[in-house]
């Protein structure tokens, strides 16, 4: 069966790679760079190396430090308006998934008429976006490698995505030095998010030989390095491996979609303000427990990676696959991530609406290895409300 594989145009990877930022702006024929980040990063000055690199290279820049944790349609429009007023010819996303998603969505509106909700769905954007550089400061979302921007749907609740080949970055800069100061909590939940991206793509219906290779390597890197990065944020080797893993996973799931973990995790109540990576983390164990019987060969591999042990010579495929839920729970325990939706502000009366929204997320469920009804999703939520 024929398949098509897309990815970003250019990757600059390595410790200290941020110093190449001005050259990359010039390579895109730009001279005025609009930097999008969030208030928290700007407050502690994580973006300073980027600003210094641009200034040293003669690039005029403006900092927009208003990216929201859960980007809304209004916030995307505001970012776009500010970039237009500055006269930006290149937009740079600097931060975690929210800042990068804000940047990608704004890059669309800088070349296409808004509002952004016109483009919720797949390949509805008519014109190429403004040249875009993405620089992640976490190792998890993989947003820098994908063609999707996930936004809060303030009209209908939950989150929705704009998916378009025009949303691939022109250049991605991967510099793990930018992650050295991440708190352990953020390291944990973004790292698990990277693993979930790779796993859902690897086990999903749309997997290809190329995405399998990318996702398998990503999972191995996360499995071997996430605990070390969590325990010691200055571990350069572990940090670089996690940054690389996140990018590989992004290249993987960006070509296949995710599955039921994302279908559920992205439809939890917006007012709970649950970080994306955290939602993916605590939704993962019960979701893989539901899924594994549909693709035991691959879930056996996932379980072995989580355990750090190839058990193919001493356990059956089904026994290894059946261990995947417990193996995931053990990882979360090591990273001090609690399971149970009630721990994160979700109320029991929220569950039916969550199930409705998750079941409506066909873009995600269509790639899930096991078909899931609305009632099955609700049963999973209820069973794991206090788990």
UniProtKB/Swiss-Prot annotation:
It catalyses: 2-hydroxyethane-1-sulfonate + NAD(+) = sulfoacetaldehyde + NADH + H(+). In contrast to some members of the family, a metal cofactor is not required for catalytic activity. Taurine is an abundant dietary and host-derived molecule whose metabolism to hydrogen sulfide (H2S) by members of the human gut microbiota has many prominent connections to host health and disease. The human gut bacterium and opportunistic pathogen Bilophila wadsworthia produces H2S when respiring sulfite (HSO3-) released from organosulfonate substrates such as taurine and isethionate. CDD domains: Fe-ADH. Pathway: Organosulfur degradation; alkanesulfonate degradation. Involved in an anaerobic respiration pathway that converts the sulfonate taurine (2-aminoethanesulfonate) to ammonia, acetate and sulfide. Catalyzes the NADH-dependent reduction of sulfoacetaldehyde to 2-hydroxyethane-1-sulfonate (isethionate). Does not accept acetaldehyde as a substrate. GO terms for biological process: alkanesulfonate catabolic process. Pfam families: ADH_Fe_C, Fe-ADH. SUPFAM superfamilies: Dehydroquinate synthase-like. Its EC number is 1.1.1.433. This is Sulfoacetaldehyde reductase. It comes from the Bacteria. GO terms for molecular function: alcohol dehydrogenase (NAD+) activity; metal ion binding. InterPro entries: ADH_Fe/GldA (IPR001670), ADH_Fe_C (IPR056798), ADH_Fe_CS (IPR018211), Alcohol_dehydrogenase_Fe (IPR039697). PANTHER family: ALCOHOL DEHYDROGENASE, HYDROXYACID-OXOACID TRANSHYDROGENASE, MITOCHONDRIAL.
């Amino acid at each position: 069966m024929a398949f098509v594989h897309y990815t970003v145009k250019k990757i600059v990877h390595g410790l200290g790679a941020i110093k190449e930022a001005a050259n990359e702006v010039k390579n895109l024929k730009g001279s005025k760079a609009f930097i999008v980040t969030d208030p928290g990063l700007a407050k502690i000055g994580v973006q300073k190396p980027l600003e210094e690199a641009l200034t040293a290279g003669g690039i005029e820049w403006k900092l927009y430090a208003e990216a929201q944790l859960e980007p809304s349609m209004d916030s995307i429009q505001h970012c776009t308006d500010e970039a237009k007023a500055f006269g930006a010819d290149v937009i740079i996303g600097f931060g975690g998934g929210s800042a990068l998603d804000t940047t990608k969505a704004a890059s669309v509106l800088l070349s296409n008429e808004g509002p952004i909700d016109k483009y919720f769905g797949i390949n509805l954007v008519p014109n190429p976006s403004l040249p875009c550089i993405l620089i992640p400061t976490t190792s998890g979302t993989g947003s820098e490698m994908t063609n999707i921007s996930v936004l809060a749907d303030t009209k209908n609740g939950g989150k929705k995505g704009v998916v378009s080949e025009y949303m691939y970055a022109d250049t991605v800069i991967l510099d793990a030095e930018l992650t050295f100061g991440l708190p352990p909590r953020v390291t944990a939940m973004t790292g698990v998010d990277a693993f979930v991206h790779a796993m859902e793509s690897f086990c999903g219906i749309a997997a290809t030989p190329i995405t399998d290779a990318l996702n398998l390597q990503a999972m191995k890197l996360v499995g071997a390095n996430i605990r070390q990065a969590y325990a010691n944020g200055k571990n350069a080797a572990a940090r670089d491996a996690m940054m690389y893993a996140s990018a590989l996973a992004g290249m993987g799931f960006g070509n296949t979609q995710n599955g039921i973990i994302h279908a559920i995790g992205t439809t939890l109540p917006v007012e709970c303000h649950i970080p994306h990576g955290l939602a993916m983390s605590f939704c993962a164990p019960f979701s893989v427990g539901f899924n594994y019987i549909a693709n035991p060969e691959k879930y056996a591999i996932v379980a072995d990676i989580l355990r750090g042990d190839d058990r193919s010579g001493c356990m059956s495929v089904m026994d290894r696959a059946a261990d995947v839920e417990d193996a995931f729970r053990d990882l979360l325990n090591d990273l001090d991530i609690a399971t149970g939706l009630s721990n994160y502000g979700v109320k029991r009366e929220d569950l039916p609406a969550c199930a409705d929204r998750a079941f409506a997320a066909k873009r995600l469920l269509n790639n899930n290895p096991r078909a899931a009804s609305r009632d099955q999703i609700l049963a999973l939520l209820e069973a794991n409300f206090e788990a």
